[in-house]
Amino acid sequence: MKIWENLIEDTKKIIPSDVQCEIKMINSIDSLTRFANSHIHQNVEEEMTDLYLTFHSDGKTTNLNFNITSLGSIDEVVKKALSEIENNPKDSSWSGLASKENSYDGYRNLSPENPDLRAQKVKDFIDQGGSFNGAGYCSSNVSNVFVWNTNGLSSSDTATSAFLDGIFRSETSSGSSHLGHKTLKNIDGEKVGQEAYSIAKESQNPQDIDPGVYEVILGPDAVSTILVFLAVYGFNAKSKVDGTSPIEIDTEQFDKKITLVDDPHKEGALNFKIDASGSPKAQTEIITNGVPKSYFHTRRTSTELNEKNTFHEMFGWGDSFGGLGTNLYLQPGGISKDEMISNVKKGIYINEFWYCRV
């Protein structure tokens, strides 16, 4: 992108030779179609470009964030950063900048998805609901990231995503379903609608159950929620640094059937293939046969824990958040959901957990 190229050229001219600098730019186009009462009522699109700058000099660090519309002169930004550095404390866990050899070229000049296609996906969903009331949204996104630093690294990547999320309601029940993919054309609106309708229909006129011991089967959404919380609060190395993570590497903490990997290169994987340092991501072994194998590391956490960096630094979150795996894959078992249910004598099926917070 021309605006990025010009920014870096201008920055190179004014950065003092004894200052380490890293600049990241995120450009995203978010498109959204919303529906309620089984009718589309909103169609919007928003483009944003944000900049994240890090400066390090004399053992001190400062970070500055700007929206591109409020950037002004890069010369003034550098002056502001150098002034702030003088008043900052020493950064004892500074881990440096990514090397030039880590550069990655993944930028693609892509256009947003057609809103008519989002509308068609919504129609496909609504058509499955019969007399039930439908609501939800269909979204699509194109995001580009660029990373440059004074070590000579120059990286870029492009990621796309599309989601259809909907719910059907009867007088006594509701059923929801959603699906995500890299492109809208791979979203099956009929399938999503059929699943939501089936859940709403089968859960009509619910009855209380007696307290007791029940076998529990978790649906994919419920399992995904558990994995997200494990990733953020367990395998995030920042949680380990802070002493809040329950995860112990190379200690059997899960059932032996549990194997979990983070793989940004798996077919259909969403999100970027570089982390916020500009370095390429790789498949990471998280749990193998019930045994934790790795935390999600950033440059800073790998330095603080003296462990290998796994390159899971998040764009836009800064050092305070830590690392996060964004392409988690749980190794499947050997039987289907229907087979599992048929083997249960007294049990509960949980489709999703509701409103989970920490």
Predicted regions and their residues:
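Acidic low-complexity segments
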Residues: 3-8, 12, 19-32, 72-157, ...
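A generic local secondary-structure boundary/capping motif
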Residues: 11-12, 40-43, 123-128, 150-158, ...
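N-terminal alpha-helical targeting/anchoring segments
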Residues: 30-86
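Extended amphipathic alpha-helical scaffolds
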Residues: 33, 120-191, 238-261, 265
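Residue-level structural signal for beta-strand termini and adjacent loop
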Residues: 66-69, 180, 298-300
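Dual-mode signal for accessory low-complexity, basic/Gly-rich regions
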Residues: 249-358
